[in-house]
Amino acid sequence: MARATEIITGAESTNKLGYQCLQHELVDGFFNRINLLVASQAIKDRVARAEKTLDELRDPVKRAMKLWGIGSDAVSRMETECERVCRDPGERKLRRFCDMITSVFNLMRDRGGMRLEVFQVELMRGFFIGIAANQFRDDLFKYKHIILDLLGLATPDIVAFNPFCPSMDTGREINRIFDEYGKNYTLALAPRQCGKTTIMVILLAAMISYLDIEIVVQAQHKTMCETLYDRVELVLHEIQHSPWYPEENRIVTIKGTTETREFIYDPAYKGTTRVHFLSSSPNAARGQIPDFVLIDEAAFVNPASLLSLLPLLAVKNRKQIHISSHIAKSWVTRVETIMGSDGKRAFHVINQRFKCDGHAHLPGMMCPCSAVFCPTHIDLNESIQELINNITPGGCELELTGGDGAGVLKRDVATPFSEELVRQFMTNAVPDLSGVKRVFIAVDPTYANGTQSSFGVCTFAELNNGMFLVVALEEVAIGEMRSILMHFYTTVLMAHVDYILGIINRKDIPIIFLPEQNTFMFDNETLWSHLSGAAERKFGIKLLVYRQFNKSGTTEIGKLVSGNKASMVIKVHNMMEADMLGRVMTVASFGEIVKGLYLHNKHVISKYYRADTVKTITDARDAIANPRDIEDFKKLPPADSAEYIFRYLGGTEVSVAHGDDGIFKAGTELVTRLGCELMNVSLKSVGRTVKVITGGKRYQGGSYSRDDLFSAFLLGTSMMGRPDDATDGLFIVT
């Protein structure tokens, strides 16, 4: 007999009854519907006949008659064919899937009629519908209406739906519900002690009991993982020793440790289920290929751990569920704002609170709209609210009610550079430089020993209309350049001067060196001496330097920003909004290229002295003392000899080739980095002052975050709108 469905490839085809379908009949929706109905009935009739034949062959007398009549080979072939027709893997999977859903309801009934909260019902629906695609694959279309019926989501039309003779409207409604709950990522937010973990433990135990699947469960630390496993094991035992669970389908044995548990069943029932209970660490889940991922208290889990799991969402038919309490300013609060290409929410988000947004400003811990979501075992009263809020203002609304306490907890914090504003600045690109008034090379240097800082540079071109354009950027870790720091800084800054002279093609434009004042004033003077001398020798120009007046009336090189940083940030924000801050189309960067050239020279010198390793000085105090004479030099080991020669020669001469387009690729990357550093900036009110928080110098994921590029950018923009007769400082040659 022909297959239940067929692919129409020509103008004609034959239906299941042998009728030759003409072209006009193939495009007739009513004819196709009747044809599918007949085909569906034909399949059912075929299965019924096969089951009847198998029943006859199981009867000893009838089997003997068949053997006598057609022979043993024919009977064997008949039996095999009938078993093939009746054996539908999808039907067996459906039976187990339905048993899994039913077991959850049976367990709740056995527990005395356990009442689910609204968010628990939504979470359960997202769980079952989300893993259905992994279990049924291409056969899912046949069973969607059955699953929706079991979960209480089916209308009468959905209950009566025939997937082989579908109603278009009902089919669309089924797909709409599946698209809503069946997204590959579900985030469930609910206040403390509402039962997030409780419902997931039950669902995990049911999944382990019925499905062939690999699972990853992640929590903050090992103790939480062990607690989760103990709870799952208890519910698993409760399910498998219930009267409604078949005894022959119980777990045969459990192998492994908490990190990888293998639940082994009789192969005649189902395969092995593996569950990995992993603590939060960046690489704990790498190498795993789970079908289902659960993360408990996701808002508090190490971000690096999330980054090892979230990329798995790109794999089809995988499901992740993250559950968490609310936390102000966390990434979990922004997930529901992510939209798909269809304008709808990209992910399934469940956000249960006891107080809605419309009543958030009113006193009390609940509102008439959302009070129904408060579980009966939680008693909220004003005394508890006052106690918690005495410790942390807004803490009760956040921890117990699920309200957004961010406005209360962080009302003294402002984020001046929003994503939209930064994007506006980055897209404000000017194709060429015309009408340049002067150029500022703003530098955030570091001279300290053992610091994690980088060398930050931001070169601006100021136009006649007052607009500032970013021309070149640097943010280079200086650890490997410690021994030749001044030479390295001078080479990079000279590359900026060379680039500026090339693109404006004029030498009469003032180029001003603008370093940040710090405790190493002598080093700033030394750097200026190196730079001004090199520029005069190579280009025949005299650079200017900014000197700021101090309290005694004398001038010091550079600009002091520590006391004015907040006002400078606000000024930059206003200038960005007014489109007075932009960039050239091709921002350049030379630092990493120059650093690579110096490291190459260092390697060549070390190779000449046959040093096994290249000695890297990250702290000037670790550098070798200068040898007093040639005899002292000869006594040095190869690595120290190479390091001394490298330092003595100033790294030797290096220069960036004018045809190296790598400077623009590096510049584009730094423009993006500058945007990220800008978005990390916040203003916090501390007493009567406003503190600028840049987010730099923090250890994250094995490295320190940086803010040196932002510091140089902020320093340069401080010169915006500065009148020529300003009395804060001077632009002078020496």
From Swiss-Prot:
The keyword DNA damage does not apply. Keywords: ATP-binding, Nucleotide-binding, Viral genome packaging, Viral release from host cell. InterPro entries: NAT10/TcmA_helicase, P-loop_NTPase. It comes from the Viruses. One of its GO terms (molecular function) is ATP binding. Gene3D superfamilies: P-loop containing nucleotide triphosphate hydrolases (3.40.50.300). ATP binds at A190, P191, R192, Q193, C194, G195, K196, T197. The keyword Nucleotide-binding applies. This is Probable DNA-packaging protein.
